[in-house]
Amino acid sequence: MYTDLKDKVVVITGGSTGLGRAMAVRFGQEEAKVVINYYNNEEEALDAKKEVEEAGGQAIIVQGDVTKEEDVVNLVQTAIKEFGTLDVMINNAGVENPVPSHELSLDNWNKVIDTNLTGAFLGSREAIKYFVENDIKGNVINMSSVHEMIPWPLFVHYAASKGGMKLMTETLALEYAPKGIRVNNIGPGAMNTPINAEKFADPVQRADVESMIPMGYIGKPEEVAAVAAFLASSQASYVTGITLFADGGMTKYPSFQAGRG
């Protein structure tokens, strides 16, 4: 646990399910004030809010579409109005869907880029604007992926969004480091989240994915949440501009694990 996270105001986009929910609950355990953004499932968001409160934190929910500038502005302003400030912005909302690249429509491409990359930029921009204007040494955490460095056939739009996020985060980190504002990525590997539930329920598909992970198991959302808590804390005060992978070693060329090559 990180005592300095108590009463910190943390905004999480896509915070009602999956990795976002796990992070919301972890910050609840840290006794933070959590702003849970959700897209359209209010019941799910209210359940997440209750879980955060039961964990020891405070929470509000804010509906919004991260691809819409006005919604992201409203999200940040609502957090500030409700809790008086902003300390940590976590841009977690994301989408993915497999399509052969030669069949990928422009609408599909735009949906993924707009959600994963533009949404993260808008969240980063609004948070940093507030930090700069109020001389706050704030913290931005962007949810990237192992696919910011590993090519992913059938997911060219997703891989492009995460590759773009890598350099966006590094650029923002460099630009605002003199003001004490830290910007980092988390790069999850394969995770036991609702979006993967059907796939991992199939023993064959699960074993295939596990074979690509040197540590041999699919990650738990709580393991990503632990990384987020670390990056948000003063224990990471000298850390900026990195991607911290929580991937069980997936990015470390697992095919070479047995000495092959």
Swiss-Prot record:
Positions bound to substrate = 145
- What catalytic activity is recorded? D-glucose + NAD(+) = D-glucono-1,5-lactone + NADH + H(+); D-glucose + NADP(+) = D-glucono-1,5-lactone + NADPH + H(+)
Q: Where does NAD(+) bind?
A: 11-35
Active-site residues? 158 (proton acceptor)
Claim: NAD is one of the keywords in the record: yes
In Pfam terms, one family for this protein is adh_short_C2
Which keywords does the record carry?
Answer: NAD, Oxidoreductase
Q: Which Gene3D superfamilies match?
A: NAD(P)-binding Rossmann-like Domain (3.40.50.720)
E.C. numbers: 1.1.1.47
- InterPro entries reported for this sequence: NAD(P)-bd_dom_sf, Sc_DH/Rdtase_CS, SDR_fam
Q: Which is an annotated GO molecular function term of this record?
A: glucose 1-dehydrogenase (NADP+) activity
Other comment: Prefers NAD to NADP; 2M NaCl enhances its pH and thermostability.
Q: Which family does it belong to?
A: Belongs to the short-chain dehydrogenases/reductases (SDR) family.
Subunit organization: Homotetramer.
Name the UniProt record assigns to this protein: Glucose 1-dehydrogenase 4
Q: Which gene encodes it?
A: gdhIV
